[in-house]
């Protein structure tokens, strides 16, 4: 795996985690 592929993978995972956290926060809000 090249460095570029690893970087893109980390970016995709990071974006997914951020989206998941914001989704959970929206659910917790009334």
Curated annotation (Swiss-Prot):
Topology with respect to the bilayer: Single-pass membrane protein
Location (main, coarse): membrane
Transmembrane segments: 4-24
Keywords from the named record: Cell membrane, Membrane, Toxin-antitoxin system, Transmembrane, Transmembrane helix
One Pfam match: Hol_Tox
InterPro entries to which the protein is assigned, alphabetical: BsrE-like
Superkingdom classification of source: Bacteria
Locations listed in the record: Cell membrane
Induction line: Accumulates by 2 hours post-innoculation with maximal expression at 4 hours, and has disappeared by 8 hours in rich media. Slightly different results were found in another study; in rich medium, expression increased slowly over time and was maximal at 6 hours. In minimal medium without glucose expression decreased as growth progressed, while in minimal medium plus glucose expression was constant during growth. SR5 antitoxin RNA is always present at levels equal to or in excess of toxin mRNA.
Remarks, miscellaneous: Encoded in the prophage-like P6 region.
Protein name in UniProt: Small toxic protein BsrE
Protein encoded by which gene: bsrE
